[in-house]
Swiss-Prot record:
<dbReference type="GO" id="GO:0005524">
    <property type="term" value="F:ATP binding"/>
</dbReference>
<dbReference type="Pfam" id="PF17864">
    <property type="entry name" value="AAA_lid_4"/>
</dbReference>
<comment type="similarity">
    <text>Belongs to the RuvB family.</text>
</comment>
<dbReference type="InterPro" id="IPR027417">
    <property type="entry name" value="P-loop_NTPase"/>
</dbReference>
<dbReference type="InterPro" id="IPR041445">
    <property type="entry name" value="AAA_lid_4"/>
</dbReference>
<feature type="binding site">
    <location>
        <position position="236"/>
    </location>
    <ligand>
        <name>ATP</name>
    </ligand>
</feature>
<feature type="binding site">
    <location>
        <position position="189"/>
    </location>
    <ligand>
        <name>ATP</name>
    </ligand>
</feature>
<feature type="binding site">
    <location>
        <position position="199"/>
    </location>
    <ligand>
        <name>ATP</name>
    </ligand>
</feature>
<keyword id="KW-0963">Cytoplasm</keyword>
<dbReference type="InterPro" id="IPR008823">
    <property type="entry name" value="RuvB_C"/>
</dbReference>
<feature type="binding site">
    <location>
        <position position="84"/>
    </location>
    <ligand>
        <name>Mg(2+)</name>
    </ligand>
</feature>
<dbReference type="Pfam" id="PF05491">
    <property type="entry name" value="RuvB_C"/>
</dbReference>
<feature type="binding site">
    <location>
        <position position="333"/>
    </location>
    <ligand>
        <name>DNA</name>
    </ligand>
</feature>
<dbReference type="GO" id="GO:0016887">
    <property type="term" value="F:ATP hydrolysis activity"/>
</dbReference>
<dbReference type="InterPro" id="IPR004605">
    <property type="entry name" value="DNA_helicase_Holl-junc_RuvB"/>
</dbReference>
<dbReference type="InterPro" id="IPR003593">
    <property type="entry name" value="AAA+_ATPase"/>
</dbReference>
<feature type="binding site">
    <location>
        <position position="328"/>
    </location>
    <ligand>
        <name>DNA</name>
    </ligand>
</feature>
Amino acid sequence: MTEDNPQFNQWYEQDTEVDHLLRDAAANDEEQRSELSLRPQFLREYIGQEALKEELNVYISAAKQREEALDHVLLFGPPGLGKTTLAMIIANEMNVNIKTTSGPAIEKPGDLVALLNELEPGDILFIDEIHRIPTNIEEIMYSAMEDYFVDIMVGQGPTARPVHFPLPPFTLIGATTRPGMLSKPLRDRFGIINSLQYYTPEELQQIVVRTADIFNAPIKSEGAYEISLRSRGTPRIANRLLKRVRDFAQVEGKDAIDKNIVTIGLDKLRVDNRGLDETDHKLLETMIEYYKGGPVGLNTIAANIGEESETLEAMVEPYLLQIGFLQRTPRGRVVTEAGYTHLGHAYQRKL
């Protein structure tokens, strides 16, 4: 930390407040906070992402043997796959502290410097939604990541002057659902870049059983598997569906969560046997009914169903692409034959 630097202390007190950066990041995701008790603490407890775990284990072990900070890490993939959890696990495995914030919370250079000032040697700064950091902030990060220092202007007008702030060796972990929005200079400064993949039903079944045990909610194997099939390959969704099914089981007086109560509960929640919800159905049905299955632009689809195009691109479209119900083409999105079949429509091959 640079607390012994009087120039920093004066600027720091006047320009920013680090607590609000950390609070804002936490307050932005109530669901993540509620899931803290469900998160594994170490790699050996983490289910799925086997190749990624093996790589991280090597990098972490090597950094600890050299007594160095871990290289900067970029994690990308759809929401809910465990990027934040992995950041916490890396901190635990390295036995260092972690500061957590989000890209939108870092609004000015002083915000970033304030966060970096909180770090001790080897600590981790985790930035969720790192693709949303402003360009001028991103440029300051270059020297911080490469050479562990930042230069920032202190004061205003004619009295403004550059001040050099040395930083301790640290690890930046960035998480994003949209890696294509990161600039090449920023992306190139991450030494470890990994994508998280959708989970298999078998992996999700293990996660559901583990979560049910934490909830002290008895669950049968076929019940856990049925939840996994409807969870869109995503642990966060699996845990959320389990919570709701647990409510149905309790009200119905069930001793354990079985496949029957899972089916009843999730049918009432309008989550079908492939994990598609109302928004998915509305998107596909609109494309079929009004645009003959496409091709049609994402903005047009969003306007038709009353959703933001950014929401559809980040939250809805990836899974439909993954399971083969939707295709991207140069002319727009197209519903596939599998998508037609799932919705019970006759497919007419386009010439």
